[in-house]
Amino acid sequence: MKLIIFLLLSLNAYSALHQEVELIYEDFNRSYLLYVPENITKKEKTDLVIGLHGYTGTASGFETQTTGGFSKSADRYGFIAIYPQGLHFNSSQNDASTYISSWNDLAGSKTNTSSGEICAVDADIYPQYPNCKNGGRCSWSSCNDDLGFVKRIIELTKNQYEIKNIYVLGMSNGGMMAQALACEYPNLFKGVVNVVGMQHKGLSCIPNEPVNFIIYGGAKDTTVPPVKIKSSDGYFYEP
């Protein structure tokens, strides 16, 4: 019983420290988790780090599954942490309900590129977002303006706190999104980290202005391979 009470208290403490912020963007209900270390004041200049979850992931999942609790790093190094939530829905494909969430990194919402289709003829087909129009058979991510959504989050945070530098990191589809943000708004970020999130063939981008940028790829990763080969589910990626 003592263990159960302790776990409940820990959960309540976690919920209290991470504020869920809700907003309407493009007529959709969107949200993100905001974590501000106790020693940071609104008048103090501080850094902002944005963490983006992967495909089918959650904002809270990114925090808890990254380095044993990413907000602990915010406490240790003194920065504000934000975990946006990708647009999500429940798919009933193959007679089973599946939670789907993703980011529109301007690649996964397409099928055709200047280099051909982003997936092979025998590729696995993933549930498509109800709001996506004419995405094609390879389309698997949200079609919403997620770049603008993240930028809006930054604007709202700047209205409340004195932000010095902004960093964004993402895992898998979140890494793809981080790279897209670097290409779209290179002057907005001090640093960008893409972890195992290669872009689809023909859609890889390079920022047109200098930005600190790191891509991590797994040499034996068959889901999102770091080299130009077909992935295990039949999709094509490139660094």
Question: Which role does the model predict for each range below?
Answer:
Residues K2-N12:
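Sec-dependent N-terminal signal peptides
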Residues E44-T46, A59-T64, S92-N104, Q179-L181, ...:
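Short, solvent-exposed loop/turn and secondary-structure capping segments
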Residues I40, G68, D75, K190-P239:
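The feature captures the conserved acid-bearing segment of alpha/beta-hydrolase catalytic domains
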Residues I40, G54-T58, L87-S91, S172-M176, ...:
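Solvent-exposed loop/turn segments at secondary-structure junctions
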Residues N104-Y161, A180:
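Alpha/beta-hydrolase active-site loop
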Residues D47-N90, A96-S109:
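N-terminal cap/lid subdomain of alpha/beta-hydrolase-fold enzymes
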Residues A13-L48, S60-I80, S142, G148-K151, ...:
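A domain-start/cap signature at the N-terminus of enzymes
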